[in-house]
Design a protein with these regions (language model features):
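Basic, often amphipathic N-terminal segments
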Residues: 1-100, 113, 117-196, 212-230
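Generic recognition of long tandem-repeat/solenoid scaffolds
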Residues: 8, 104-108
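Low-complexity, intrinsically disordered Gly/Pro/Thr-rich segments
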Residues: 192, 201-209
Length: 230
Protein backbone atom coordinates (compact mmCIF):
# COMPACT_ATOMS: atom_id res chain seq x y z
CA UNK A 1 0.00 0.00 0.00
CA UNK A 2 1.21 3.50 -0.83
CA UNK A 3 0.93 6.11 1.91
CA UNK A 4 0.47 9.87 1.82
CA UNK A 5 2.01 10.57 5.21
CA UNK A 6 3.86 8.73 7.93
CA UNK A 7 3.99 9.05 11.73
CA UNK A 8 5.54 7.41 14.77
CA UNK A 9 2.97 6.21 17.29
CA UNK A 10 2.92 4.43 20.59
CA UNK A 11 0.34 1.66 20.15
CA UNK A 12 -0.20 -0.85 23.00
CA UNK A 13 -0.76 -3.62 20.47
CA UNK A 14 -0.93 -6.60 22.82
CA UNK A 15 -2.89 -4.91 25.57
CA UNK A 16 -6.57 -4.73 26.52
CA UNK A 17 -6.29 -0.96 26.09
CA UNK A 18 -5.80 -1.43 22.35
CA UNK A 19 -8.86 -3.66 22.03
CA UNK A 20 -11.00 -1.27 24.05
CA UNK A 21 -9.69 1.79 22.23
CA UNK A 22 -10.19 0.32 18.77
CA UNK A 23 -13.75 -0.61 19.68
CA UNK A 24 -14.35 2.86 21.12
CA UNK A 25 -13.00 4.69 18.06
CA UNK A 26 -14.24 2.27 15.40
CA UNK A 27 -10.92 1.73 13.59
CA UNK A 28 -8.21 -0.91 13.99
CA UNK A 29 -4.87 0.41 12.71
CA UNK A 30 -3.16 -2.98 13.02
CA UNK A 31 -5.74 -4.90 10.98
CA UNK A 32 -6.39 -1.87 8.79
CA UNK A 33 -10.15 -2.22 9.00
CA UNK A 34 -13.19 -0.82 10.87
CA UNK A 35 -13.82 -2.08 14.39
CA UNK A 36 -17.35 -2.58 15.68
CA UNK A 37 -18.39 0.18 18.06
CA UNK A 38 -20.43 -0.77 21.10
CA UNK A 39 -23.59 1.08 22.05
CA UNK A 40 -23.24 3.34 25.08
CA UNK A 41 -25.45 5.94 26.79
CA UNK A 42 -28.41 6.77 24.55
CA UNK A 43 -27.68 10.49 24.98
CA UNK A 44 -24.38 10.04 23.18
CA UNK A 45 -23.82 9.23 19.52
CA UNK A 46 -20.48 7.45 19.82
CA UNK A 47 -19.97 7.39 16.06
CA UNK A 48 -20.30 11.17 15.97
CA UNK A 49 -18.12 12.05 18.97
CA UNK A 50 -15.30 9.78 17.73
CA UNK A 51 -15.48 10.85 14.09
CA UNK A 52 -12.45 13.19 14.22
CA UNK A 53 -9.93 10.83 15.87
CA UNK A 54 -11.24 7.62 14.26
CA UNK A 55 -8.93 7.54 11.24
CA UNK A 56 -5.84 7.70 13.46
CA UNK A 57 -6.82 4.69 15.57
CA UNK A 58 -5.94 4.10 19.22
CA UNK A 59 -2.52 5.68 19.73
CA UNK A 60 -0.34 8.34 21.29
CA UNK A 61 1.61 10.44 18.81
CA UNK A 62 5.38 10.50 19.28
CA UNK A 63 6.28 12.10 15.93
CA UNK A 64 3.38 13.80 14.15
CA UNK A 65 2.36 12.88 10.57
CA UNK A 66 4.77 14.02 7.86
CA UNK A 67 5.33 13.59 4.15
CA UNK A 68 8.35 11.55 3.10
CA UNK A 69 11.36 13.58 1.97
CA UNK A 70 12.65 13.29 -1.59
CA UNK A 71 15.30 10.65 -2.07
CA UNK A 72 14.35 8.42 0.87
CA UNK A 73 12.13 5.36 1.06
CA UNK A 74 9.70 3.83 3.50
CA UNK A 75 12.04 0.87 3.99
CA UNK A 76 14.89 3.23 4.91
CA UNK A 77 12.65 4.99 7.43
CA UNK A 78 11.65 1.62 8.87
CA UNK A 79 15.28 0.54 9.21
CA UNK A 80 16.23 3.78 10.94
CA UNK A 81 13.33 3.44 13.38
CA UNK A 82 14.49 -0.09 14.22
CA UNK A 83 18.02 1.18 14.84
CA UNK A 84 16.73 4.00 17.02
CA UNK A 85 14.52 1.69 19.07
CA UNK A 86 17.52 -0.50 19.91
CA UNK A 87 18.77 2.38 22.09
CA UNK A 88 15.48 2.92 23.94
CA UNK A 89 14.46 1.58 27.34
CA UNK A 90 10.88 0.64 28.35
CA UNK A 91 8.97 3.36 30.20
CA UNK A 92 6.35 2.80 32.89
CA UNK A 93 3.27 5.00 33.24
CA UNK A 94 -0.40 4.90 34.19
CA UNK A 95 -3.40 6.65 32.63
CA UNK A 96 -6.39 8.74 33.61
CA UNK A 97 -9.19 10.51 31.71
CA UNK A 98 -8.53 14.19 30.94
CA UNK A 99 -10.15 17.00 29.00
CA UNK A 100 -7.77 18.81 26.65
CA UNK A 101 -9.04 21.91 24.84
CA UNK A 102 -12.57 20.54 24.59
CA UNK A 103 -11.78 16.94 23.64
CA UNK A 104 -11.18 13.91 25.85
CA UNK A 105 -8.07 11.77 26.08
CA UNK A 106 -6.17 9.36 28.26
CA UNK A 107 -3.11 11.04 29.78
CA UNK A 108 -0.38 10.03 32.25
CA UNK A 109 -1.42 10.31 35.89
CA UNK A 110 1.86 12.06 36.68
CA UNK A 111 4.31 14.12 34.62
CA UNK A 112 6.68 11.77 32.82
CA UNK A 113 10.00 13.25 31.71
CA UNK A 114 11.14 9.94 30.21
CA UNK A 115 8.34 10.02 27.64
CA UNK A 116 9.21 13.62 26.74
CA UNK A 117 12.87 12.67 26.31
CA UNK A 118 11.87 9.75 24.08
CA UNK A 119 9.66 12.05 22.01
CA UNK A 120 12.52 14.54 21.57
CA UNK A 121 14.93 11.83 20.47
CA UNK A 122 12.50 10.38 17.93
CA UNK A 123 11.56 13.78 16.48
CA UNK A 124 15.20 14.79 16.03
CA UNK A 125 16.74 11.52 14.86
CA UNK A 126 14.09 10.76 12.24
CA UNK A 127 13.77 14.28 10.91
CA UNK A 128 15.92 13.63 7.84
CA UNK A 129 13.02 11.56 6.49
CA UNK A 130 10.48 14.39 6.76
CA UNK A 131 9.57 16.58 3.80
CA UNK A 132 9.21 20.32 4.58
CA UNK A 133 5.65 21.46 5.31
CA UNK A 134 3.75 22.71 2.28
CA UNK A 135 2.41 26.23 2.03
CA UNK A 136 -1.11 24.92 2.69
CA UNK A 137 0.08 23.08 5.80
CA UNK A 138 1.73 26.24 7.14
CA UNK A 139 -1.46 28.24 6.57
CA UNK A 140 -3.57 25.57 8.29
CA UNK A 141 -1.32 25.37 11.36
CA UNK A 142 -1.01 29.13 11.72
CA UNK A 143 -4.77 29.51 12.03
CA UNK A 144 -4.34 28.35 15.64
CA UNK A 145 -2.52 31.48 16.85
CA UNK A 146 0.87 29.89 17.41
CA UNK A 147 3.44 31.31 19.78
CA UNK A 148 6.76 32.44 18.33
CA UNK A 149 8.42 29.23 19.53
CA UNK A 150 5.66 27.07 18.07
CA UNK A 151 5.95 28.82 14.72
CA UNK A 152 9.70 28.27 14.71
CA UNK A 153 9.12 24.59 15.46
CA UNK A 154 6.62 24.42 12.61
CA UNK A 155 9.16 25.83 10.16
CA UNK A 156 12.17 23.84 11.41
CA UNK A 157 10.54 20.57 12.47
CA UNK A 158 7.24 20.51 10.55
CA UNK A 159 4.96 20.58 13.61
CA UNK A 160 4.37 23.25 16.27
CA UNK A 161 3.51 21.22 19.37
CA UNK A 162 6.79 19.48 20.14
CA UNK A 163 9.50 19.50 22.79
CA UNK A 164 8.25 21.80 25.58
CA UNK A 165 4.76 21.83 24.04
CA UNK A 166 4.59 18.05 23.65
CA UNK A 167 1.92 16.40 25.78
CA UNK A 168 1.58 12.62 25.66
CA UNK A 169 -2.09 11.72 25.19
CA UNK A 170 -4.37 9.12 23.63
CA UNK A 171 -7.23 10.95 21.94
CA UNK A 172 -10.70 9.47 22.40
CA UNK A 173 -13.10 12.13 21.06
CA UNK A 174 -13.45 15.23 19.00
CA UNK A 175 -14.62 18.45 20.66
CA UNK A 176 -17.56 17.81 22.96
CA UNK A 177 -20.41 20.31 23.60
CA UNK A 178 -20.52 21.61 27.18
CA UNK A 179 -23.90 20.03 27.86
CA UNK A 180 -22.51 16.55 27.11
CA UNK A 181 -19.12 16.75 28.83
CA UNK A 182 -20.15 15.21 32.14
CA UNK A 183 -21.99 12.37 30.42
CA UNK A 184 -19.09 11.68 28.06
CA UNK A 185 -16.62 11.73 30.95
CA UNK A 186 -18.69 9.17 32.86
CA UNK A 187 -19.02 6.91 29.82
CA UNK A 188 -15.30 7.00 29.07
CA UNK A 189 -14.41 6.18 32.67
CA UNK A 190 -16.88 3.31 32.66
CA UNK A 191 -15.71 1.95 29.29
CA UNK A 192 -11.98 2.16 30.07
CA UNK A 193 -12.26 1.30 33.78
CA UNK A 194 -10.32 -2.00 33.40
CA UNK A 195 -7.17 -0.12 32.30
CA UNK A 196 -7.32 3.15 34.24
CA UNK A 197 -4.68 3.62 36.95
CA UNK A 198 -2.98 0.41 35.81
CA UNK A 199 0.76 0.34 35.09
CA UNK A 200 1.65 0.29 31.38
CA UNK A 201 5.05 -0.45 29.90
CA UNK A 202 5.92 1.37 26.70
CA UNK A 203 8.33 -1.04 25.05
CA UNK A 204 7.79 -0.53 21.31
CA UNK A 205 6.98 2.12 18.73
CA UNK A 206 4.94 1.82 15.55
CA UNK A 207 5.58 3.25 12.12
CA UNK A 208 2.19 4.07 10.61
CA UNK A 209 1.09 5.39 7.26
CA UNK A 210 -1.94 7.34 6.08
CA UNK A 211 -3.56 5.46 3.24
CA UNK A 212 -5.46 7.04 0.38
CA UNK A 213 -8.62 6.03 2.25
CA UNK A 214 -7.62 8.66 4.84
CA UNK A 215 -7.11 6.07 7.57
CA UNK A 216 -3.84 5.21 9.30
CA UNK A 217 -2.37 1.71 9.07
CA UNK A 218 0.45 0.07 11.02
CA UNK A 219 3.46 -0.63 8.82
CA UNK A 220 5.62 -2.14 11.55
CA UNK A 221 5.92 -2.42 15.33
CA UNK A 222 9.47 -2.07 16.61
CA UNK A 223 10.49 -3.23 20.11
CA UNK A 224 12.96 -1.38 22.30
CA UNK A 225 16.40 -2.94 22.60
CA UNK A 226 17.32 -1.97 26.14
CA UNK A 227 16.10 -3.67 29.31
CA UNK A 228 13.78 -2.10 31.85
CA UNK A 229 15.41 -0.55 34.90
CA UNK A 230 13.76 -3.18 37.07
Amino acid sequence: MNFKRYAIYYIPSNDLLYKLGSSWLGWDTILGQPASQLEINSDINIEKITETPRKYGLHATIKAPFGLADGVSTSELERQLRTLCLSLKPIEFSLEVSELNGFFALTPTVKNTEIRELHTKVVCELDEFRAPPTKDELIKRRRNQLTSEQDQNLIKWGYPYIFRDFYFHITLTGKIPKNLKNTVTDEIKKFFEPVLQRIFLMSELALVGEGHDGNFHVICQTPFGQKSKK
